[in-house]
Each structure stands twice: as C-alpha cells, then as structure tokens.
Amino acid sequence: MFFCSSMPLLAEALPLKNTQLGDPEFIKFHGLKLAYMTGSMANGIASENLVISSGNEGLLSSFGAAGLIPSVIEKAINNIQQALPDGPYAFNLIHSPSEDAIERAAVDLYLKYRVRTIEASAFLGLTPNIVRYRVAGLRRSKENQVEITNRVIAKISRIEVASKFMAPAPEAILNKLLNDKSITREQAQLAAAVPMADDITVEADSGGHTDNRPLVSLLPAIIALREKFQEQYGYSDTIRVGAAGGIGTPASALAAFMMGAAYVVTGSINQACVEAAASDHSKGLLAKAEMADVIMAPAAD
C-alpha cells in the first residue's frame, strides 16, 4: 500500500469477501454461506449429486424435477434429505399447463416429505397447486407473527408474472382450496399477510425458459416493482430479487450484485460440471462452446 507520508490515513477499504456479496437476509433465510444458487435443469440434469455437493458447501441448489415421474422425484427427495437433513436444498416445481396432474403430484410429494423450499419456474400465472404448497405451510407463532415454513423462489422473466408472485394468494384460489379442505381457514387468513414468493429470480436471456430480456433492463424494473408491492402491502419481510441468465463468469456475477441483485443463480454452465447428470459428450461440447455457437430453439416441453 502506498500513500503520501504527509497526509494522514483516514480510512482503509479492505477487499470484499465473497460472503459479503448479495443480501445477508437471503443467506440467513436459507441457511447458506453465500448468496449463490444453482438453478434446476430438467430431467434430473440438476442431479442429486449436484444438490448434495452444493449443499455441503453452503450453497442452495435446486433439483431438476421437471420431466421426471413421481417415483423418481420421491427417490431423489429421500436421498437428498438423508444426505442434507438440515438442508440447504430446493426442488423444482415447473408449471404444467396441459398436464395439471403432473404439477399436482409434485406438490403432493413436497408436502408429504416436507420439502421446505421450491423453485417455481415457467409459470404464466398462479395455480391452485403452488398456492396450496405455499399456504399449507403458514402458521401463527407464539408472538402472533406469520411463520412461513414452505418457501417459494419464483423464477420469472416477465413483469406481469412477477406481480402475481409479489402479491398475496388470490382469494378465489384460497376459497377453492378451503372448499377442498386442502388448507385451513386460519391458513387462508394468514395468506393475506404474505407474498406468494419469498424470493424472485429475474431470469434474463438464459438457456432455459426465457423471454430474452437483457438483465440490465429487467433486473432494475423488477426491483422497482418490488418496492411498489412492499409499500402497497406492507409486508414485514422484504421480497428479495435475484439475478439469473448469462451469469457465466465471476465478472458477470459481480455486475449483477452491483446492480442490486440479492443473490445470483447459475444454470446452464453447471451442466458441464462433474456432478451434472449429462453425458460426457454433452459436457465436452458445452465446455468448448462460444457465445456465437448458441441459438434459441423451442423448449422440449
């Protein structure tokens, strides 16, 4: 360190540690070491091994449950919970507009085995399934506060979808769940005090379901939307907004944090890692791919 000997040293800025990046509330809420998450890749590509390895290092990883039959998801839940009894881990809940039974079966498993964190993706709006998962985990504490035991991280790429997850559960869906005896009357009442999601992942121009929005435009817009909903509903806890899509280097992760992201999520780059359930051939191609080698294509689902 060099400074002018004739001038007093008033302050010294030490290098930031990676544990200081992002929102400390995200780290505390999910029991992590870093404000870093690996997103779900369908058909189990985001594998049990990836989730467990990440969890052991204090990172939140979401199992790629989309496209898998219930028995395979159930086996993954058992294996991951055995390896990470205290977490952290998450499971994906993908919206299935043409096959409601698939979405419902996943929620049945998550409630049965007390999977406490889900990553909701590809939703166009709220469904009774995701509302049931969220609201069935609400209870009143001894201090008369609303306790949220079923956590939702909503991955979105459109403002109108983010709005639905930042608002409380719709009354019409709550009434339907009440009539079905899927939730209690107290849970329906408590639902008015909390948003549908604890965290909103802004999925910009990613390798998954995306609307190709640039992160530099979409992230600030969603953060501003969050401020509007916080003021409108007066939530006791702040909805956190993270960033995903195109975060493939330390520099791009730092840029997201500097724009105000509470956390960052990586996805496609993890498909090339040892723990991913992809073939060695696929991993080799991904490791060699450049930006110009990638183009948008229809999603398999």
What are these language model-derived features?
Residues 118-120, 243, 265:
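A structural signal for short, well-ordered beta-strand segments and their strand-loop junctions
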